[in-house]
Amino acid sequence: IVIDYLQLIAGSGRGGENRQQEVSAISRSLKALARELEVPVIALSQLSRSVAQRQDKRPMMSDIRESGSIEQDADIVAFLYREDYYDREGENDGTIEIIIAKQRNGPVGDVKLAFVKEYNKFVNLEVRYDDAMA
């Protein structure tokens, strides 16, 4: 199940809940749904605007919009980062970073891939023998 984008899901409408509480309840419900149906649920979320104010634009867990419970409930949190999105004047090297910020059952880290913008396609970077030996 893919949810594009989590913050568009309407809350329960119960009085007294703010949007952060609603998003937390939605996040918990999706986690319960995944367990009940024994299927993965991929929920896309928007980042807060604070990313644009920082020098280093790479997204962090605290940038997830409207709820800390999203990062708590998730088994995996991954971000996409393209330097050329923020530095349009710079040289586009055609790469994208997948930042694995949280993985409940494994390691975290970054993976750099080639990004073919015309096709919205990710491909493995070619590793030359010279680069691999350095």
What label would you give each PLM region?
Residues I1-L44:
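Helical hairpin unit composed of two closely spaced alpha helices linked by a short loop
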Residues G15, R28-E38, R49-A134:
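C-terminal regions of RecA-like/P-loop NTPase motor modules
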